[in-house]
Amino acid sequence: MENHTTPRTTWTPRIARRLEIVTTGGMDSILRIGAAMSADGYPVRDFTADVRDGVPYSSVTCTVSLTSAEAATFTERLGTLPAVISVEPC
């Protein structure tokens, strides 16, 4: 009988990182951030948006599971999105 499963050759641990992303542009920017994280394949455990009328800044608080290599480029990657002001651990 043949074994049809392929053993995993590499395994990279992921660490849950809680982040706050500050942005301008209201709900549209919040949705773009969520879409970008989804398109890049980041596992997002929770995603909370705080958008208030008349306030120039909005924020996303989220928990993202990242490898150490992904963590090194995550802030840079999100920083390329228009309207992202900062990405900080919380």
Stretch-by-stretch model annotation:
Residues 1-58, 63-90:
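Long, contiguous binding/interaction regions
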